[in-house]
Amino acid sequence: HPIYKDLLSHIEKESKINLSGYNDILAGHAVDASISKVAGGTITITNKGKSEIMMPLLITYEDGTTERENVNPSQQDLILEKYRNIKSAILDPDQTSLDINPENNRYPRPGIGIRIFTGFDSPSKKDIYLSPLIGYNSYDGIMLGLSMYNSTFPAKNLKWNITPFYGFDSDQLVGQSWISYDTKFKSDKIRKIQYRLGIKSFSIANNEDANIQLRYIRIDPCITLHHYHNPASKLYSKTSLRQLWTGTDISYLEIDRFTQNITRLTHNRYNFDKLQPNELEVELEYNQYHAGSFLDSQDYLKLSLDYRHGFLFGKHRKLDIRLFAAKFLMNSQRQSSSYNNLLAQGSIALLNQGFTDYSYNDYYFDRQGQSKRAYRQIGYHGGGFKDALGSANGRIGQSNDFAMAINLKTHLPFGQAKLPLKLFFDAGYARTKSFSADPLKGEVFYSGGVMIEIGDGLFAFHLPLIVSQKISDIYKSESRNLLSKITFSMDLHRLNPWELADDYIF
């Protein structure tokens, strides 16, 4: 069967024009040619990308005349001698080459332009985008913020984002920022290497007696190797090494700050097949944490696996299966009956809420699990259960040794297929204990019900109807009615526009 390479070969043969650069583009390699230097009548063009493509060059001389010619920047610098002083030059003036960074296609370099929200990057300005934001959590209250960033589409190699918020309840400046740089490769093994540094800090509690606001900070440098796959395969994979440092203010036990040093080696593999999409995450995590002089330092080494597979069984109808397992290969607190607190961190949680998110990876309205409404927010990491029991019942479904789970969700096989109503069922096993003197023993949990899901996991509401005994006992002890069992979730990481535009383009 003919493929795109056959078409390009035929056009090359008939036109006598080298089109190998377009073959590189179709193979997923970026175009980034740059006017790197202009001195008198000499112009230097550098190919910063991994595709060699013919593109027009428009030169304006100081005497007012213009000249237009086609150039083909290779992997070496292309130096053109014009013997007349050059006033300005534009590479690819008609924007037909799919160059990912049109800002460096001009001499002189463009000035700064301010744009609101998003759009295609302007070739005549160095765009800075502004987006006003509003947020909320239980301790900062309503937050007003402004997100500033330098790249939308096509994504630049150097990207940054600064998003400060002001919390009206905390009277604090909070928020997050990051900067990243991509090194692209023309290789059948490596697509790019991304270097990234992020920082995030929000309030986590308040000490009303001392009238101080407690907050956390997370700093996470990361290097990610993006493997190359033929775009026609619908596969994508990456391997990342991340070092996280977290510091959490504490107002009791004479401890000022609880710190963690977490190292994560993670491999992700995605298959964007329409009929059977699936993804795999394998992660090895080492954590050394310390709660001041009051407690000894502790550490662990944890291996986890997360596999998700979807089965399309009708138009707009899908069954999703998720398998999760995690095991502590080493844990100095394996025999502890404390979970995700000062005494024992990194515990495997079948039921995830704000107080189990020990590395501050996600966004929660309430991280203490005590707010009457906000604590009903759950996360899909770990065991992926849809129940919210609060921090007072935080020992349920947690383990410092081993846990595994299966999560099922499906559209209804009848009725309107486009309705977001689904059924779910979660089952899990955890080796756990209630008291430190007890031996570790396996416990089984399950929960099933109905859910409303928007955006394939972006936002969801869940109503558990059938639950295992321990979960049922908590519901009964708190006299929960049907409405008070409803939980909600949101996965804001799925809204990352830079990953959507540059990586997950299937």
Write out the residue ranges for each language-model feature.
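C-terminal outer-membrane beta-barrel translocator/porin domains of Gram-negative envelope proteins
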Residues: 134, 192-212, 219-226, 249, ...
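Transmembrane beta-strand segments that form the barrel wall of outer-membrane beta-barrel proteins
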Residues: 126-138, 144-152, 156-168, 191-209, ...
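Beta-strand-rich binding/interaction modules
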Residues: 2-93
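Outer-membrane beta-barrel transmembrane domain signature
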Residues: 308, 376-387, 403, 412-414, ...
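Outer-membrane beta-barrel initiation region
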Residues: 63-76, 80-192, 221-229, 252-276, ...
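Residues that define the transmembrane beta-barrel architecture of outer-membrane proteins
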Residues: 126, 140-144, 171-175, 191-193, ...
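Strand-loop-strand
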Residues: 162-185, 203-205, 435-473
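Predominantly the C-terminal beta-signal and adjacent terminal strand-loop region
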Residues: 317-331, 343-350, 455-506
